[in-house]
Amino acid sequence: MTINALLLSSSRVGDTPYLAHAIPFIKPLTTQAQKWIFIPYAGVSMSYDTYLASVVMGLAELNLDISGIHQHPDPCQAIKDADGILIGGGNTFHLLHELYRYNLINLIREKVAQGTPYVGWSAGANVSGASIKTTNDMPIIEPPSFDALKIVPFQLNPHYSNYRTPGHNGETRAQRLLEFTKVEPLTPVIAIAEGSALWRRDNTLVLLGENPAYLFCGEQQEMLIPIGSDLSHLLK
């Protein structure tokens, strides 16, 4: 089977409606997948039912059968029965903590490797990488490990922007990612701007969307990746 995974930087771009910009990206993954399971564990500041309702509404035009994993008595069985997997944004630490809590890490990894389509945005994209060490989120809870789903073998940083607010003296995002590359100089980080996504199809990886991404790896810092770039070499 072929890995088919879409890793979105965000659920919105600019002032567009929730998930509206992502519909054209998600649609090709739904041609043979009707029954989807949504994992809302990153949504700490809202109820899981509220989160699910927003996703169902946002993706309504795709006519998918979407249920929340929290609605199922057996989360593992829900993953096994699903045609596709959706993981939303929020707090990456809480998301990963719950994936470990319910023993879903290896199961999701295996399902995706067997061809089950995967769509993740923001935190849902973060956990698709090798680890969550390059998330933007506050560590509000400690997962058993930072190791993540490893759908792609590198690091991700969604919502990327290196804007510095005038008068603000904190580190920029690029400076934070430089810190990671000093500790792990051989591990690439792909920083994805809002409105863009990575699409992995088996051994191919391409950048989709309207904004470029950036590569951080060792001495390479904030190297521009144009839209449409073939990044398949990063899968090796």
Swiss-Prot record:
For this protein, the Enzyme Commission number is: 3.4.13.21
Q: Where in the cell is it found?
A: Cytoplasm
Main location as per UniProt: cytoplasm
Q: Which UniProt keywords apply?
A: Cytoplasm, Dipeptidase, Hydrolase, Protease, Serine protease
Give the EC class as a word: hydrolase
Read off the Pfam families from this record: Peptidase_S51
Residues forming the catalytic site? S122, D137, H159
Q: Molecular function terms in GO for this entry?
A: dipeptidase activity; serine-type peptidase activity
Biological process annotations from GO: proteolysis
Function of the molecule: Hydrolyzes dipeptides containing N-terminal aspartate residues. May play a role in allowing the cell to use peptide aspartate to spare carbon otherwise required for the synthesis of the aspartate family of amino acids.
Query: Mind telling me what this protein is named?
Result: Peptidase E
Species for this entry: Shewanella putrefaciens (strain CN-32 / ATCC BAA-453)
